[in-house]
Amino acid sequence: MIKRELYMSRIRPFIGTELIKVMTGIRRCGKSVMLELIKQELTESGVSPTQFISINFEDMSYSHLQTAQALHDEITKRAKEIGGKVYLFFDEIQEVKDWEKCINSFRVSLDCDIYITGSNAKLLSGELATYLGGRYVEFVIYPFSFGEFMELYRSISPDASIQQCFQKYLLAGGMPYLANLRYADAPSKQYLHDLFNSVQLKDIVKRNKIRDVDLLERIIAYVIANVGTTFSATSLAKFLKNEQRTVAPETILNYIKYCCEAYLFYQVKREDLQGKQILASNEKYYIADHGIREAVFGGNMRDINLILENIVYLELLRRGYEVTVGRTGDKEIDFVCDKRGEKLYVQVTYLLASEETVNREFGAYDSIRDNFPKYVVSLDEFDMSRNGIKHRNIRDFLLAEEWN
């Protein structure tokens, strides 16, 4: 079991506190493993596993606990039987109706330490925020980074070079379970296709009571095909009209929002760096795992420039950056990144193969006058840094402990 220290280092300070620890992220990204890692640390610190109460609400053996009252009664009974402090681990808690009511009740009435996971970004919105009144901390879990992937892939193929690992990562992506399939092509593709269908059905269609599933599938296919490119709901509506589907832009925006809430896509807003304001239209979207894109849509190598962008974007999120697309006049910076006031700029391209490409990628920074780090990231092996702008091979960039 890979340690996932990036997340554990953030969660560790809250272990044992009264704050509810909430882990969210796309289905099968490794949230359950995080619960096991936390149990492992608790056990190593002297807590007996007999104090743990663990429930995965996708397990049919717990189908009788699908309401807040049933769950409350069961946990209260088991906590009394155990005695002393109990550690509650609830996986995919959104399957329980009104679950936030009993979670708050446990926090108030039991001597307990609570950990929950869920596959929807709205988990902490609305009623839960009201019930818990800020007494929780959230951690978004992502599929494997390139570094995590390489660690596991080399446990299967010890002689694989960094280049070979990255080539595999471009197609397979970072979903943890693929290691159990030894990253074999056909089984991996089947697994990712089934995972995509599960996210679409359980976390989007069922949760949002969508009736026009065909329309949803068309919208998802369009966004997947156009990861990393700016488009508007109006342009997508025109595209659908050409397919004899008349759809209001508002409906399209709602469907994409549902996909983002299920962590299938991430929306990146555009920022006018001169006017210092967020622009209202033509956002970009990236997919939670580029391996899913290859399995469902194909073409990762054909669209490698966009896939490299997708990989870098997810790495920026993993490391805690807030990310926008920057616009300066008629030029665009792929990623403007901010973490507690510390900025970072990143341009991503496939290869700096011509003087025109070099001028475009490095020239995007011409009007940026601050002294924050500026990167151009590509698959080129040779360092082409210039004018204070750092050039990095994408593998080195992804594996670097820090960027400065």
Regions found by a protein language model. Give the residues of each.
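Pre-Walker A adenine-sensing motif
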Residues: 2-16
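Short glycine-rich substrate-engagement loop in P-loop NTPases that contacts/grips substrate
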Residues: 54-84
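Catalytic cores of nucleic-acid endonucleases
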Residues: 326, 350-395
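Hydrophobic anchor at the beta1->P-loop junction of P-loop NTPases
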Residues: 23
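Interdomain motor-coupling "hinge/lid" segment immediately C-terminal to the ATP-binding subdomain
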Residues: 121, 126-230, 263
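Accessory nucleic acid-recognition modules appended to NTPase machines
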Residues: 183-343
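Hydrophobic positions on the alpha1 helix immediately C-terminal to the Walker A/P-loop
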Residues: 34, 38
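Conserved lysine of the Walker
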Residues: 31
